[in-house]
């Protein structure tokens, strides 16, 4: 199979809604000029051996030419000269050119890494959850095999918890939810077993493979450092250090949480770009003004999604250092993050931008658009969980940039280069969390936990697209390209 990429001399105005036959529209995503000439790419080779991947993969074969990008080893954020300056005329509300490549497939098979706990226990070593001695499962009392999903459990409870969360299972206790969980009762009452799993600290956010990425590992290291610092402070106090020394230590800690000049510059640049790329308010208001038919609601949601993607492309273009990445990596990052960034931006609109009292109305209208409750329920659950964190706009912007610059996306050739761009953003976000919510040292970890929840929407979204295609729904060409809809 040979794919051709042809440059567009003039922007092509997209019709609001058209059928999604293979189009000639492609995004030349981070280029200042239209693509010239014709490029070909040979597609071959299996996507992967894990059979669980195949139901959700929109492409079965792919191979890209090897490119060795040149990445400077110097600091990415040392001066303003690194930040891209984009002319206003680049933006077009029409179509963007994009080279087609397979969208990211979420599930890659479970690994030991996915079972590492979010809160690392002191007894754990480099064995990723293995323990010494005959310790017992905190859920059922059977012999524990290690720390799974943040709790010391046996293999049986680990598998039960994984299956229950993955399938969104709902169980019913025949005894009114009063079962005492043990090795016998665990097979008799699934509701009480699942409740005991959660009570003992098992976390759904540890569930999905690929979610315990470098971001979460960094989060774990940071939490460990916070705990060690707290223990050190307590020890110093118990040793009778005078108040002046304690005050000095506290002042020193506070000074460490201040943003450096480079970090302030980075944050200012991110916020300036984020604020310029806004969803038109009239699109959001349209679905609230009056009740439409299911088909009309779907068309409005399609228009909203198209604007989300346009905003995402513009914001992504202006991320510091992004255009130094290999072009294929840029496309992989954009297409791999499109769904997650869209839901994160939607969560901000849902919690901060809607007129007072309109959240329930929006939920009702979306439910009337023909989308299954199977997908709508977790979506609004996520929106509300984001709202509980009381995130600032700075945190929304940084979290969106971190989502885009995820080095674990599929088809990334130079992951180290992407990590170099993401790491400073994580550092700034961590400091802002300490500054904004000093009384809540877990706030940073909670934000990163929401990123793991976001990854599940790739799976939900892929299933929604499959159901929409069966029902012959129409999308704009831009959505067809970014979502790889044939």
From Swiss-Prot:
<dbReference type="GO" id="GO:0005654">
    <property type="term" value="C:nucleoplasm"/>
</dbReference>
<feature type="modified residue" description="N6-acetyllysine; by EP300">
    <location>
        <position position="227"/>
    </location>
</feature>
<dbReference type="GO" id="GO:0010903">
    <property type="term" value="P:negative regulation of very-low-density lipoprotein particle remodeling"/>
</dbReference>
<dbReference type="GO" id="GO:0070857">
    <property type="term" value="P:regulation of bile acid biosynthetic process"/>
</dbReference>
<dbReference type="InterPro" id="IPR000536">
    <property type="entry name" value="Nucl_hrmn_rcpt_lig-bd"/>
</dbReference>
<protein>
    <recommendedName>
        <fullName>Bile acid receptor</fullName>
    </recommendedName>
</protein>
<feature type="binding site">
    <location>
        <position position="375"/>
    </location>
    <ligand>
        <name>chenodeoxycholate</name>
    </ligand>
</feature>
<dbReference type="GO" id="GO:0032689">
    <property type="term" value="P:negative regulation of type II interferon production"/>
</dbReference>
<dbReference type="GO" id="GO:0007219">
    <property type="term" value="P:Notch signaling pathway"/>
</dbReference>
<dbReference type="InterPro" id="IPR050234">
    <property type="entry name" value="Nuclear_hormone_rcpt_NR1"/>
</dbReference>
<keyword id="KW-0007">Acetylation</keyword>
<keyword id="KW-0675">Receptor</keyword>
<feature type="modified residue" description="Phosphothreonine; by PKC/PRKCZ">
    <location>
        <position position="456"/>
    </location>
</feature>
<dbReference type="GO" id="GO:0038186">
    <property type="term" value="F:bile acid nuclear receptor activity"/>
</dbReference>
<dbReference type="GO" id="GO:0006954">
    <property type="term" value="P:inflammatory response"/>
</dbReference>
<dbReference type="GO" id="GO:0000122">
    <property type="term" value="P:negative regulation of transcription by RNA polymerase II"/>
</dbReference>
<keyword id="KW-0225">Disease variant</keyword>
<dbReference type="GO" id="GO:0005634">
    <property type="term" value="C:nucleus"/>
</dbReference>
<keyword id="KW-0805">Transcription regulation</keyword>
<dbReference type="GO" id="GO:0005829">
    <property type="term" value="C:cytosol"/>
</dbReference>
<keyword id="KW-0010">Activator</keyword>
<feature type="modified residue" description="N6-acetyllysine; by EP300">
    <location>
        <position position="167"/>
    </location>
</feature>
<dbReference type="GO" id="GO:0038185">
    <property type="term" value="P:nuclear receptor-mediated bile acid signaling pathway"/>
</dbReference>
<feature type="DNA-binding region" description="Nuclear receptor">
    <location>
        <begin position="134"/>
        <end position="209"/>
    </location>
</feature>
<dbReference type="GO" id="GO:0006366">
    <property type="term" value="P:transcription by RNA polymerase II"/>
</dbReference>
<dbReference type="GO" id="GO:0000976">
    <property type="term" value="F:transcription cis-regulatory region binding"/>
</dbReference>
<dbReference type="GO" id="GO:0042632">
    <property type="term" value="P:cholesterol homeostasis"/>
</dbReference>
<keyword id="KW-0804">Transcription</keyword>
<dbReference type="GO" id="GO:0004879">
    <property type="term" value="F:nuclear receptor activity"/>
</dbReference>
<dbReference type="GO" id="GO:0035356">
    <property type="term" value="P:intracellular triglyceride homeostasis"/>
</dbReference>
<feature type="cross-link" description="Glycyl lysine isopeptide (Lys-Gly) (interchain with G-Cter in SUMO1)">
    <location>
        <position position="289"/>
    </location>
</feature>
<keyword id="KW-1017">Isopeptide bond</keyword>
<dbReference type="GO" id="GO:0008270">
    <property type="term" value="F:zinc ion binding"/>
</dbReference>
<dbReference type="InterPro" id="IPR001728">
    <property type="entry name" value="ThyrH_rcpt"/>
</dbReference>
<keyword id="KW-0539">Nucleus</keyword>
<dbReference type="InterPro" id="IPR013088">
    <property type="entry name" value="Znf_NHR/GATA"/>
</dbReference>
<comment type="subunit">
    <text>Heterodimer (via C-terminus) with RXRA (via DBD); the heterodimerization enhances the binding affinity for LXXLL motifs from coactivators. Binds DNA predominantly as a heterodimer with RXRA. After activation by agonist binding interacts with coactivators. Interacts with NCOA1, NCOA2, PPARGC1A, CARM1, SETD7, PRMT1, GPS2, SMARCA4 and MED1. Interacts with EP300 and SMARCD1. Interacts with XRCC5 and XRCC6; decreasing NR1H4/FXR transactivation activity towards ABCB11/BSEP. Interacts with PAGR1 and NCOA6; indicative for an association with an MLL2/MLL3 complex (ASCOM).</text>
</comment>
<dbReference type="GO" id="GO:2000213">
    <property type="term" value="P:positive regulation of glutamate metabolic process"/>
</dbReference>
<dbReference type="GO" id="GO:0032715">
    <property type="term" value="P:negative regulation of interleukin-6 production"/>
</dbReference>
<dbReference type="GO" id="GO:0071638">
    <property type="term" value="P:negative regulation of monocyte chemotactic protein-1 production"/>
</dbReference>
<comment type="similarity">
    <text>Belongs to the nuclear hormone receptor family. NR1 subfamily.</text>
</comment>
<dbReference type="GO" id="GO:0015721">
    <property type="term" value="P:bile acid and bile salt transport"/>
</dbReference>
